[in-house]
Amino acid sequence: MEMVRRRLTVVGVGLVACLGCVSFGPNSILSYLYYDYGPEATLEALESAEINPENLALANLEKAMVLTELGRYEESLDALETAALRLDADAETAAVVSSRGYGPWLPEYHERVLAKTLAMANLMALYDTVGAAAAADLALEEIAAIGCGECEFGFTRLLAALAYGGAGRFSDGLGALEGLEAEGRPAALVGEVRRRLERGVAGFQPEGLAPPPVESERFVVAILLLGRGPYKEPATLDLGPGHTIRWSRWVPREPQTIAWAVMDLDEPVRSAEFTDVEEVAVAGLDLRRRRVIAGDESPSSPKKRDARHWTSMPASLQVVAVELPSESDAVDLV
């Protein structure tokens, strides 16, 4: 399993020094470092800066994304675990507001799902089949708990199917694929995974998801993190006459050209299953808005409007499978 990140970068004039505390808004130095100078500069800033206690969970998610991009998967898993433990504690103290005017950062729905998805991807990259399948359980449980029918987490679900297949849990893999072959969705890769899972359920026990030893059917599966995700800005939510609360909204970036290609390869590329981060972010926040209006969920209400978010989130997450030529064991994605 390979993971590739392609950022749309802007060349700056010199690297600014990151002093004091790291901030996590749309125009923060962290976002600037990550998208203009890459993961190494971002990691250095995160490890050298003083992080305010209410931002520790978010800082560890940012660190996890950077470490994954650098191929340091075990360290990324450690950062994700630290973030999860902090979020559990912060959820109990969300009403507490610090002297800076913020309470502890709590993730939006899609950020919760994608944190668990990142853990699953790291374990797959480490070839920990049992651990990846257990992480798939947690990711799908999170999707079910959120209950957002409009949130298309196809990337997470296909990745979960691959993880289950690798662990020999073929029926669970088929369950993860439910609905992914609907009309209008890219089905070639999903169909290929489904056929292999069905073969496993029927009693053919391949090693993970490996196909029969036919030389012309050698694939590499890659995870692509493409572009720059939406940013969050302060807003208000109208709850009725004379009653508004502090809220936020997701704003898309300027139109981006998000593309990739396989270098020097004429072999077919299986269609990708993907998640559009802006779509799931907007759909998830709209669901939370409806729940707050209905009284089913309590909003956090800090003194200041809150635009903190996971700034290194990509615009699109994709899974692709590339058929390898017989003389090669790798391909270059650009």
What name fits each language-model region?
Residues A17-G20:
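C-terminal motif of bacterial Sec signal peptides marking the signal peptidase cleavage site
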Residues V22-F24:
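Bacterial signal peptide processing site
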Residues S28, E62, V66-E69, E111-L118, ...:
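"A position-specific structural signal for the A-helix of alpha-solenoid helical repeats
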Residues S31-L46, L77-V96, L126-E141:
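Helix-turn-helix repeat elements of alpha-solenoid scaffolds
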Residues N55-A57, R86-A95, A144-E152, E181-F204:
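Boundary/linker segments of alpha-helical solenoid repeat arrays
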Residues D78-D88, D137-L138, L162-P186:
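TPR/TPR-like (Sel1-like) alpha-helical repeat modules
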Residues S300-V334:
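C-terminal soluble interaction/assembly domains
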